[in-house]
Amino acid sequence: MRSLIEVQRKLLPELLSVMQKRYQILQYIRLMQPIGRRNLAVSLGLTERVLRSEVTFLKEQDLIDIYPSGMTLTNEGELLLAELEEVMKEVSGLRLLETTLKEAFSLSEVVVVSGDSDQSPWVKNEMGRASVSCIKERLVGKKNTVAVTGGTTLAAVAEMMTPDLKHPDVLFVPARGGLGENVQNQANTICAKMAEKSMSHYRLLHVPDQLSDEAYRSIIGEPSIKDMLHLIKSAGMVVHGIGDAMTMAERRKTPQADLEKVKNGHAVGEAFGYYFNHQGEVVHKVKTVGIQLDDLKNNKCVIAVAGGSSKAKAIKAFMQQAHDSILITDEGAAKELVRDFN
């Protein structure tokens, strides 16, 4: 396939350019359908005149339908888009990025979606769609309990969840307590939404994300909390985000003394309440109720979802000690990561 693509790149470069543009249009319609032409043009940075001619072509090929409410993909469009994905990964260099990152971090799999979620918010939805696909593929045997963390990226994963899981007994649980942030970005809310959209089940953990030593000892001694923590820690799959260290510290309203530890330790990334420096070393840990780093080593399928070029350092910090896990990211972050290796 690669040799054919290289031939086309040399002899018919405009063909690949047109194909990429039409692929992106179909991709965005799939994510946001039904969507109007004006919104689509603005989102993709195209003029309405250019988009009008492309939409006319796609309609003539029976790839999209146009309704008063907006454009949607036809069944033919859905099938073509799925078939095009592998080709477009070769054309755009995403496959090479995936291979490079997989080898650099010793991961079991890397999925890179096109675009940069820092620049185009819809890319986060595409990461969400890729994450849902990854979750479904790996829900086998005893791995029917899925623990999920909070954050805007995981909220996008929940948004893209669909009701076609092959295992109706899947149970979604929060990986940890709430952050006290925007309710739709809390782990409890996200796990409930994933369960509802996939027509499966969920259980919630009603405790704050971080506690004093005394409060922590008191809460984890409660029988109901103890049972819930056992269920969470025994989950066969964990889906989590990766945050920028200072952003997460500020969001948690971290005490000044702990904030100094984060700063002095040169932390750049955060996950599960652990703060990591450039070398992937833990420089600070928040006492949280839920999954700890050691829990990830117990034969779990661990899926990290994070993107945006601004998060490259945070992703690198965490993934250096997350061998054999799965990374789902975007082109913006992937290119920054690879650039950092060179």
UniProtKB/Swiss-Prot annotation:
Residue ranges the UniProt entry marks as DNA-binding: 37-56
Molecular function GO terms recorded: carbohydrate binding; DNA binding
Keyword Repressor: yes
One Pfam entry name: Sugar-bind
Keyword Lyase part of the UniProt annotation: no
Sorted UniProt keywords: DNA-binding, Repressor, Transcription, Transcription regulation
SUPFAM superfamilies per record: NagB/RpiA/CoA transferase-like (SSF100950), Winged helix' DNA-binding domain (SSF46785)
Cystine pairings recorded for this chain: none
Family in the record: Belongs to the SorC transcriptional regulatory family.
PANTHER family named in the record: CENTRAL GLYCOLYTIC GENES REGULATOR, TRANSCRIPTIONAL REGULATOR-RELATED
Known role: In the absence of glucose, represses the transcription of the gapA operon, which encodes five key glycolytic enzymes.
Subunit relationships: Homotetramer.
Protein name: Central glycolytic genes regulator
Organism annotation: Priestia megaterium (strain DSM 319 / IMG 1521)
